[in-house]
Amino acid sequence: MLDREGFRPNVGIVLLNQKNQVFWGKRIRTHSWQFPQGGIDRGETPEQAMIRELHEEVGLLREHIRIVARTRDWLRYEVPDRYIRRDARGFYKGQKQIWFLLQLVGHDWDLNLRATDHPEFDAWRWNDYWVPLDAVVEFKRGVYEIALTELARYLPRNELRNRFLRQGVRPHEQETTFDAVPGANFELPPGGSFEPNPQTSYGLDASGKPHET
């Protein structure tokens, strides 16, 4: 389902634990890490799609989370042509997203990456809310910054000081600097990166629905 401009309606999920650390998932059979996200099916509201995607990707139910906030408007990113399948080029442009900030009220053991027969992730970890955005795949970087910045107002005030980290600026009490790779505040497992899987392409499935492959 695409809008008139070629964007697929989508939801993004920022899931917090009780320490305000954020869930990151490793895409199955790749070294790419990202926030949970997924398309909105026809007839669904963004919240309904978020609850469905949350269960499909990380195994959580509505009772396991508290909805803290959501972005006010759609946030868009365009997918570069080299990641779009040839049969979708010319009319599929990218994703438009509503982002939700969620608080986990359950436990870590409620997370289940095998809740469905088509898992999206094969590993997960908690990390600080802010990460150096030069470590995020380039075409999603702007959306991540806008979403995290808009939703940060709903975090406890002691988390707001970390807003400097997204631009590599260190607060006075912080001695860490950030280069073009994840730094001390964001550790990836060996071999991990935010670069897209070279085999990933964006196109249409058998029903004509845009998807990542």
From Swiss-Prot:
Similarity-based family: Belongs to the Nudix hydrolase family. RppH subfamily.
Main EC class the enzyme belongs to: hydrolase
Annotated region described as Disordered, given as residue ranges: 185-213
Protein name: RNA pyrophosphohydrolase
Placement of sequence motif Nudix box: 38-59
GO MF term set: pyrophosphatase activity
Pfam families: NUDIX
PANTHER family found in the cross-reference section: ADP-RIBOSE PYROPHOSPHATASE, DIHYDRONEOPTERIN TRIPHOSPHATE DIPHOSPHATASE
Annotated EC: 3.6.1.-
Domain Nudix hydrolase positions: 6-149
Cofactor: a divalent metal cation
Keywords, sorted A to Z: Hydrolase
HAMAP family xrefs: Nudix_RppH
Domain of life: Bacteria
Function recorded in the entry: Accelerates the degradation of transcripts by removing pyrophosphate from the 5'-end of triphosphorylated RNA, leading to a more labile monophosphorylated state that can stimulate subsequent ribonuclease cleavage.
